């Protein structure tokens, strides 16, 4: 995975979930917050991050910084994905299918946020297995990293793009 410099990108961030986490100690309970954030430029770059802190804004800030370190490049064909793929992480699986232009994003929750910030306008998805936000996000990112354009597949097979499409 190649590093993508976030300073040259106009990134937006979206908070997917904020969890209240407690640690029980001898003196009582210690309260902290865990945040999951997705960042993207709506032009083929997207990443996610997690952060924990004693205050919500600090947890979100840490998550955004983490997300900027984990950016990936998403191949696009027009407004949709190049091909169908299943992303996996843990017990979570996400099926991502290209859709006809104008059909919109048929996805729920975390998958929708990832697709919107990646700049994918037309896609259909189905979440299979674990529906936990972090597992769904990681499975979606896994699916997007498995995406290959027709040019990349033709290069791997040492054939031309025209013969691949026939």
Curated annotation (Swiss-Prot):
Assigned protein family: Belongs to the universal ribosomal protein uS5 family.
Assembly and binders: Part of the 30S ribosomal subunit. Contacts proteins S4 and S8.
Domain named S5 DRBM: residues: 11-74
UniProt cross-references to PROSITE patterns, sorted A to Z: RIBOSOMAL_S5, S5_DSRBD
Role of this protein: With S4 and S12 plays an important role in translational accuracy.
Transmembrane annotation, as ranges: none
Pfam families in alphabetical order: Ribosomal_S5, Ribosomal_S5_C
Encoding gene (name): rpsE
Protein name (Swiss-Prot/TrEMBL): Small ribosomal subunit protein uS5
PANTHER family registered for this protein in UniProt: MITOCHONDRIAL RIBOSOMAL PROTEIN S5
Domain notes: The N-terminal domain interacts with the head of the 30S subunit; the C-terminal domain interacts with the body and contacts protein S4. The interaction surface between S4 and S5 is involved in control of translational fidelity.
The entry's keywords: Ribonucleoprotein, Ribosomal protein, RNA-binding, rRNA-binding
GO CC terms, sorted: small ribosomal subunit
Species assigned in the record: Latilactobacillus sakei subsp. sakei (strain 23K)
Gene Ontology biological process terms from the UniProt entry: translation
Signal peptide stretch: none
GO molecular function: rRNA binding; structural constituent of ribosome
């Amino acid at each position: 995975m190649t590093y993508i410099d976030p300073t040259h990108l106009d990134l937006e961030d979206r908070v997917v979930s904020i969890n209240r986490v407690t640690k029980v100690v001898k003196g009582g309970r210690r309260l902290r917050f865990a945040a999951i954030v997705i960042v993207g430029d709506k032009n083929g770059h997207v990443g996610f991050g997690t952060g924990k802190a004693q205050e919500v804004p600090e947890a979100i800030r840490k998550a955004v910084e983490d997300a900027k370190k984990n950016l990936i490049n998403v191949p696009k064909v027009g407004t949709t994905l190049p091909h169908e793929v299943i992303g996996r992480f843990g017990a979570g699986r996400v099926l991502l299918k290209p859709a006809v232009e104008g059909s919109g994003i048929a996805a729920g929750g975390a998958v929708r946020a990832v697709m919107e910030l990646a700049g994918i306008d037309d896609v259909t998805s189905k979440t299979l297995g674990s529906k936990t936000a972090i597992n769904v996000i990681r499975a979606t990112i896994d699916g997007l990293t498995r995406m290959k354009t027709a040019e990349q597949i033709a290069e791997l097979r040492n054939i031309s793009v025209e013969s691949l499409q026939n």
